[in-house]
């Protein structure tokens, strides 16, 4: 699985150096800017210095791609909000081995998730904005506080939202494209996936009448 590879790649310098196609082409807006020689490469830790990473999907079906062993092209994205730039690391499976083959920088507004990324940037950092973009009610599925082995489902009214609101990553977020073909769809599933603890939070957003709303929170 690509996930198994990328965790090792981000943690193991020797493996990383052996799995990059040096000199590594770096593109800005699809134009070749430079090539990085092996001796100038700085170890890329991706999300290993934090205990989670984030993913964006259009629908549930796309989420199954993570477990698909036949995929041979994956893009790891770093979305930088202040610079409004997306840095893409391209990986291809060559002769059975995952290799990083290029880096590409693109403006955030050119991303297939542009509308959602712009919305999420405000949703994650502005509580007043967040409150205005909640569906009434927000569907909730999460652990039952009275029973460790079962989940509870219910509705969150806007006034009780602050008690449920999860900590949302902001400033810079990750996304991994396992071959999911994004469209400017009216639904996005934003996933915060724990690296070591197996915890996962899913937020389902829908665009209704041009406005993104949080429909569902699953923890």
Task: List the predicted regions and their residue ranges.
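Extracytoplasmic/secreted envelope proteins and their assembly/folding machinery
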Residues: 3-6, 120
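Short, well-ordered alpha-helical segments enriched in acidic and aromatic residues
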Residues: 4-5, 11, 15-40, 129-146
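A structural feature that tracks compact, well-ordered secondary-structure segments
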Residues: 23-25, 89-90, 119, 203
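Surface-exposed, charged secondary-structure patches
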Residues: 26, 33-83, 144, 150-199
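Short beta-strand edge/turn micro-motifs at domain boundaries
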Residues: 81-111, 198-219
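Surface-exposed beta-loop interaction hotspot
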Residues: 95-132, 137-152
